């Protein structure tokens, strides 16, 4: 009995010490970055803003998101974080990155709250939600976005990422570009969001160091796992952007590339063969201009997902290709799957718990029709 009491006391002590340490780390960070633009709110103010947390927008492993309203009348989204070491680091990453920047294609961080175990981040509210619900519709009667709007979204996302890479005093690498992290305002203008995995580097640093691979399965650049491909750099975001474009065009979620299904194949290879033969995708009653825009999206995506980082364009070059003349675009080499026999670099523990050998989840297309 005494042993159980001692063990319980030790667990409580460790729990309290860990959370005190987290609080201290966050407070130290905030004290050292007083010049950041976001406003610090008290927890009582957060409760008023959300009207007692009545309108819940969503929930995830990080915590919950609520709709709120500032005294100015501005509608906001309030992300309440569950206290943990991971979420504490995510909180610091968010405030450190988007707390210092402003761009039309990057979500704006309005404020935050740190009050004991109560952590919150306050953003501009995006009424049209995230991009994934438009390219992976779950409702049968869902009206898809036009190809023209999808093309404009692709351009906006590219501009947002380009700004992160080149438009700030520091180089910001996002490391988690995917449809779920692209929010859409009332005019469907895209905003890059969720900077929990982002890292800040010197603007002139071409290769960066990481202690662990980071990102979401299917969008992670191969160099984060395989050492003989090349160093980790802003080209990792370029790769993720390419996979995002592929999903926007293919309108298919990621599945296991090793699934034994003869009706499915690796989508980039399939679409590469079509484009290389001069064939268009089946796009219904799309106009010729829309077909050209989608063709550009595909070719740019194929360049962005090249295996070696050195073969991928910068975001500036990718945007130049997206905005340029389709006739001037050259086809890149055919994309390949990650090779299973490449040596794996030890980047530490994978935060997603995904072994490197399983990072071959690829987008597929059904040959029986969508």
Annotate each language-model stretch with its function.
Residues 110-117, 127:
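Short beta-strand micro-motifs within the conserved protein kinase catalytic domain, predominantly
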Residues 91-96:
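Regulatory alphaC helix of protein kinase catalytic domains
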Residues 66-83, 97, 108:
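Glycine-rich ATP phosphate-binding loop
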Residues 1-34, 132-140, 200-202, 217, ...:
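Terminal membrane/secretory targeting segments in land-plant proteins
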Residues 1, 21-23, 76, 261-262, ...:
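Intrinsically disordered, low-complexity cytosolic regulatory tails
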Residues 116-124, 132-133:
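A conserved loop-to-beta-strand element in the N-lobe of protein kinase catalytic cores
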């Amino acid at each position: 009995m005494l042993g159980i009491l001692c063990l319980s006391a030790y667990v409580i002590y460790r729990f309290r010490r860990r959370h005190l340490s987290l609080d201290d780390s966050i407070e130290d960070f905030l004290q050292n970055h007083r010049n950041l633009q976001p406003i610090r709110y008290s927890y009582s103010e957060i409760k008023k803003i959300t009207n007692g947390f009545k309108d819940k927008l969503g929930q995830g492993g990080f915590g919950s998101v609520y709709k709120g309203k500032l005294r100015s009348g501005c509608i906001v989204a309030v992300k309440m974080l569950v206290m943990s070491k991971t979420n504490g680091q995510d909180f610091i990453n968010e405030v450190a990155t988007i707390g210092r920047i402003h761009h039309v294609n990057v979500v704006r961080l309005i404020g935050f709250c740190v009050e004991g175990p109560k952590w919150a981040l306050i953003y501009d509210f995006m009424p049209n939600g995230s991009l994934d619900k438009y390219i992976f519709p779950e409702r049968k009667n869902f009206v898809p976005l036009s190809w023209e709007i999808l093309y404009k979204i692709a351009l906006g996302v590219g501009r947002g990422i380009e700004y992160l890479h080149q438009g700030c005093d520091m180089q910001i690498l996002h490391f988690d570009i995917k449809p779920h992290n692209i929010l859409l305002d009332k005019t469907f203008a895209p905003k890059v969001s969720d900077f929990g995995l982002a890292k800040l580097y010197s603007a002139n640093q071409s290769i960066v160091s990481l202690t662990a691979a980071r990102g979401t399965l299917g969008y992670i650049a191969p160099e984060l796992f395989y050492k003989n491909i090349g160093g980790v750099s802003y080209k990792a975001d370029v790769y993720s952007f390419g996979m995002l474009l592929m999903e926007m065009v293919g309108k298919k979620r990621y599945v296991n590339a090793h699934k034994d299904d003869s009706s499915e194949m690796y989508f980039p290879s399939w679409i590469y063969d079509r484009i290389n033969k001069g064939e268009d995708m089946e796009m219904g009653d799309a106009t010729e201009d829309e077909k050209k825009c989608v063709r550009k999206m595909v070719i740019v995506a194929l360049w962005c997902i090249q295996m070696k980082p050195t073969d991928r364009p910068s975001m500036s070059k990718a945007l130049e290709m997206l905005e340029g003349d389709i006739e001037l675009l050259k086809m890149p080499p055919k994309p390949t799957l990650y090779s299973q026999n490449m040596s794996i670099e030890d980047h530490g523990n994978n935060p997603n718990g995904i072994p490197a050998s399983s990072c071959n989840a690829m987008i597929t297309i059904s040959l029986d029709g969508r």
